[in-house]
Amino acid sequence: MSLRIGVVTPMDNAMDAVAEAFADIWSEAEVITLLDESLYADYGGGKGVTDETYERMAVLLQYSQDSGADGILFCGSVFGRVVEAVRVDISVPVLSAQEAMIEEAFAAGSRFGVLTTVSGSLQCLLDDIERYSQENNKPYTLVQHVEDAARPIILAGDVETHDQMVADAADRMTECDCLMLGQFSMTSAVKRFADISGRPVLTAPHTAVRKLKRLLAG
């Protein structure tokens, strides 16, 4: 019997990236998706992260577990701390959006490139990188860029133009041991990236699926 993975996402444009990652890495897994767009709607509407956010996250993760999930992946990049706080009450492995990517980045070296299309996502990722560095006594340097003009384009449905803008920005970030893409919705752009020797590109969905497979399937 295949293992069931619950994917909880606040944006529907993350679903294709997650499906691609599972197809590439762990096609035998059964993936069940739970979408709650209200999380980002409220976060972007000026509320930020509130007590209600934690309560709703607890409900979502518990629902996914109750639906038979053997492991859970949450896709929203700005809710990492919320996921980490709530998952202590969940009995199956739960990954926040970025943690596996950060672990792989530090395994690859100490010079990081970080590319996002939303400043809020960038800051959350930078905070998580710094926290990992402090907790594991691993120094690092990084270059960062927000390709903010690409965000409204993908929200309008123009994935092709969005992906080309992300690829153009990525191809300028060469002086690093790895390049991290800060949002699930950026994953489709990777196929357009130039092949730069010695600079692997890390995406949140692919690194997360690799870690879940390692934890659950060996």
Mark where each language-model region is.
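Non-catalytic structural scaffold of enzyme domains
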Residues: 1-218
